[in-house]
Amino acid sequence: LIKTASLGTEDVKALLPKRAEDSNKGSFGKALIICGSKNMCGCAVLASKGALRSGAGLVKLAFPDVLYTPILSSLQECVFMPLETSENGAFDLKNEAKILDAASKSDVVLFGCGVGVFPETKALTNALITKNSTPLILDADALNCICGDVSVLKKRNCEILITPHAGEMSRLINKNVASIEKARETVITGFCREYNVTTLLKGHR
């Protein structure tokens, strides 16, 4: 059963719970953000700030350790998880166990922003889909990593939200952007039905 929904500003406000005065950061969820590569530091910073701004109580940012200095100088509120960098300047596959362990201790995981498309990141994407049980958001390069084998989504071990723009969606379903924009709802409904994932197709509509 495919369900569609529309949310406006007032709808979202009504969904936000009031926070108790005796609460702490642990009361409002733990988000694990796995982002960045040698030439893509900004997306990790923006994603982390976005998670904090949206209300996540504790945000842990996992990133290739080559980015340690620029990230440390840009963020103050996150818990840092620097990981071994591959020769490509991205996440090394040696980090898989650490990433899966951190995911198991989180309430939600975001993976993909600026991670690059390499054999290592493709393998990590597959591992998070098939071996992780925490709700998972796949964005940007995570989607580019699976566009050659989208069927991996059918092997998922967790709830998944994908957030493609039209270009990324075109690579996932092998259709041109124009045809997607002409039939956005039909395209997304069909994709959700086939792969049983929640899909947010970004755009002005």
What positions do the PLM features span?
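Small-residue (G/A/S/T)-rich helix-start motifs and N-terminal tracts that mark the onset
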Residues: 1-135, 144-161, 166-205
